[in-house]
């Protein structure tokens, strides 16, 4: 039976005469559809007669077509070898020994290549190869594939051929000889026997020629002092492993001081063995890596550093030079001097003060001590530039005395304090030519610019210390065939038709003393007879007298420095280094002025966190002798000496950089007279700066279970139990306290079968240098996300190095304060007490802690993953199956160590993240053994499973047992201090098995019960 019920949607439908009802009957949509926006052709739209049915057909077809297309995998076209090179086996990496020296950084290297592509830098661990790669050297592999390299030659900014440049230079040399005007080679420190020989031949052929060495960051005062005492322009070497007492006055020797490379020998003396470790005093203005590692750090201005040096000189030598030392430093400086004197030959003093008189006193003190750590055998041939000669060159250029200027490895238009003066003088030079990797500031104003080869594309040699000879060999053919190596150009200008390789080989034959050329190429280094520089005489008393006349800075004292990431700025276009967080401030993508809390309060400067956790700060302008830098962001730095400020060099470049990399200010403009200390005036300006800071928590707040510390006295005291300084966390079971490590919520597997990997992190040996961070980046194809994503806490580093300050003068006092909390409120209440513990001390102790996935045996991430994308192996590694991951991020929420990283975007092949690795050339650096992750996928440290599996398979193929040390991860392989040791704990003879049983061993957040396979070692301070 039919129903008479009437259904309606609105009251208006009950009225048959309603205009609304009529409209709804004739029109499906109340409002007109904005078809103009997607159909585009508005003129034809009105005459279109397409029916709704046809329209749906077209939409349906296109939807189906798009769906079918999406089912197809991407087509990747590969070009096979016509004749496969014998030495290349697809899927098997090759390693080549080589050497890098760019005038600032030096290292003996192994270069990993895959199918002919260099993809990773590793340390050459052969005996004699003592210089290891820092973060910048590890990142230099990416600069090879920089699409903004200068790919050809240019004359007057127009593309040309090398032949045209060559002809013009030869004509210019002939004109200079006829006119009797100067021909000047302006280079960085070369330390290359073959290149120096070529230059000598060039000067012989050009009688008016000069060779002037210019280093952007000068060590001229130290060179001048050493030359006046030893008779050669070089620098002393140091072996800190031989020192029981180390006193550093303004020298960041764990950073870039005099070329760096001292962390290995320093770390040997810092790991407590047989109850002994070195005692280290650091006196400095800026907080540095060396200051962070010190047992006793004195934050003082450069003026007070000079006075401290004079006092130590008096104590060690018995002199009576006038000393004007601020009262608050006297006790600690005298303590350092007395301990240094007591150490005798086991003591050493170094200084970074840019003053010849100060450097003479350093030599006098070490001579008086007969210091074993002060090594004059095999002196350093580094940063040999002369400030006076560079200044004279500019005068000669202004006077029109220079006809031809040939530059290589330098960028004076960027790095000279008064670059406008240099540019003006350059206009008076008839011909100028620059050999450069980039069309940088100097190349742009030179009449001729020549793109040169990268060190990974070149032959070369380096003798960075006397008696050692290192070779540079190409690991790939030049990516840009029109580039020209500087040495080959010199050969042609000398009228020598030889290839530079043949010239190099002939030069080396007289140095390697009959050794096999092929063997030296294979090893990358040859060690011959090492000469010793002999102490001469100098007027040390006059030097002390002159130094005592020093005056404090008028107003604030500016101390210019170089950051661990960018150094002198040569690799400013390298996104790995731009995104690398500074070990001290934890800020990336910026330079800034560091000020003390006291000075910040006086000037009204602030740092603060906004709602999303991002760090913001004030702006200032800095003025030195009439030169002003505007809008410099401010970081309030714990440990900055009151009355001093710091700014890093190497930023503010504009030429040949992608827009994203054009960050910071150029502090070289304040580097007056090549002195890193200047009187400066700071003025607060309007605005707030947004920092990309990866660590907002500055202190431990007394949480001693994260970074455990003790003193050497307690460590050595037989009356003190290990439990007292390496306390094991307890939990309650049935109201009975038991050790947390004994409690299991899961049934444990038998892990004694096969391999079981552990990674050891020694807090005593870690200097925070960050080489491991960049090595991990390279090995595991970690993406670069840019400043704004870092600011949103979306950085992708698999390994981070946390930095903590003490709230009191030491971490032990923080713990003591926390233990004495009584109730919630009051003088000893925890509410106010924890707030105070969040504020870092004016001169805090510092601790670094490398944190990566802990590869927990009872991993909280594994239990919450709904698709089993993360799981555990019998070898102790926590695995990620990227193709199973659906991006719930439950694992990241449940990880107590916060080490998982989520791909918020598709970083690969995405123009929004154009950081080298996304263009065709940049992708050549990718490791084929590691998958490139896509959007929506979680990733983390894999404990370099591709490396461990290769080691296992290689040993299986060879039918042998794996030796201790063969198992490596990218981070452990890059660590030059021994802070990171990786291995198989089931091999009871292995180093890591020994470290697991060490009294200093503990696990991070042990009370959580995750049972990690990463172990840490208690930090011991020799206070």
PLM feature segments, named:
Residues 1-334, 563, 587-591, 598-602, ...:
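N-terminal export/assembly segments and adjacent metallocofactor-ligating motifs
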Residues 438-473, 796, 903-920:
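Flexible glycine/proline-rich, aromatic-decorated loop/lid segments
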